[in-house]
Amino acid sequence: MKQYLDLMQKVLTEGTPKNDRTGTGTISIFGHQMRFNLQEGFPLVTTKRCHLRSIIHELLWFLQGDTNIAYLHENNVTIWDEWADENGDLGPVYGKQWRSWPAPDGRHIDQITTVMNQLKNDPDSRRIIVSAWNVGELDKMALAPCHAFFQFYVADGKLSCQLYQRSCDVFLGLPFNIASYALLVHMVAQQCDLQVGDFVWTGGDTHLYSNHLEQTNLQLSREPRPLPKLVIKRKPASIFDYRFEDFEIEGYDPHPGIKAPVAI
């Protein structure tokens, strides 16, 4: 994951101090891209331990169209707790937009089912896109989508994906985002009988919070280790039928975890 460490160093070196919604303060750059060849290993950061259970359960939760944290709590995942209301609701966040985008005529559009059909029936389409950025519902969301828009691309029997992330917490959030979308590419590729290609990450406001700088320097002092391998144990009937037990990571040997506060 040299690309990730290079980005951290770039933000430290070239970033501009900025205020932010949380009041914490950041140093920020605008516009950065990383490319991960998924044939070369699963892009899970090795310079600190990442909580893979949370990454997998969150993605499965998104794919179910769920926007209440009850499922996450049942599986000991707390990453959305700070934004949920007293009933555990988050408003029409990612899962709602992915699976039930409201159309003006009263229909609800299942974007995930749509892209699965496109990949199987029209893989050369340039419109194989999922958006979570629903302008009409942003004010109802507990948190506006950070990873807002992604596009699939098929060439030579390989599935690639590019994500646009409008706001990126480089230290805490980005390792989750990279692994989550890499996992999604593997799942979609398997369902469509494709090989995995590249995951391309594109960031807008790409920042380190001012209270993450010590942790960032510690992480930069560590040598990256070989990437692990993702094993998917079965092929379910649909993209929506995966379970946590279907996934195994082999050869993950990270450095110890590094704690840092979440900016809310």
From Swiss-Prot:
Give a yes or no for keyword Transferase in this entry.
yes
- The positions annotated for binding (6R)-5,10-methylene-5,6,7,8-tetrahydrofolate are 51, 169, 263
Alphabetically, which GO biological process terms does the record hold? dTMP biosynthetic process; dTTP biosynthetic process; methylation
**Keyword hit for Methyltransferase:** yes
Q: Which Pfam families match?
A: Thymidylat_synt
Name the InterPro entries for this protein: Thymidate_synth/dCMP_Mease (IPR045097), Thymidate_synth/dCMP_Mease_dom (IPR023451), Thymidate_synth/dCMP_Mease_sf (IPR036926), Thymidylate_synthase (IPR000398), Thymidylate_synthase_AS (IPR020940)
The biological pathway it contributes to is: Pyrimidine metabolism; dTTP biosynthesis
Location of the protein in the cell: Cytoplasm
A GO CC term attached to the entry? cytosol
Annotated residues that bind dUMP are located at 21, 126-127, 166-169, 177, 207-209
Q: Which UniProt keywords apply?
A: Cytoplasm, Methyltransferase, Nucleotide biosynthesis, Transferase
Classification via NCBIfam families:
PRK01827.1-3 (NF002497), PRK01827.1-5 (NF002499), thym_sym (TIGR03284)
Q: What does this protein do?
A: Catalyzes the reductive methylation of 2'-deoxyuridine-5'-monophosphate (dUMP) to 2'-deoxythymidine-5'-monophosphate (dTMP) while utilizing 5,10-methylenetetrahydrofolate (mTHF) as the methyl donor and reductant in the reaction, yielding dihydrofolate (DHF) as a by-product. This enzymatic reaction provides an intracellular de novo source of dTMP, an essential precursor for DNA biosynthesis.
Q: Subunit structure of this entry?
A: Homodimer.
Note the PANTHER family from the entry.
THYMIDYLATE SYNTHASE (PTHR11548:SF9), THYMIDYLATE SYNTHASE 1 (PTHR11548)
- This chain belongs to the protein called Thymidylate synthase
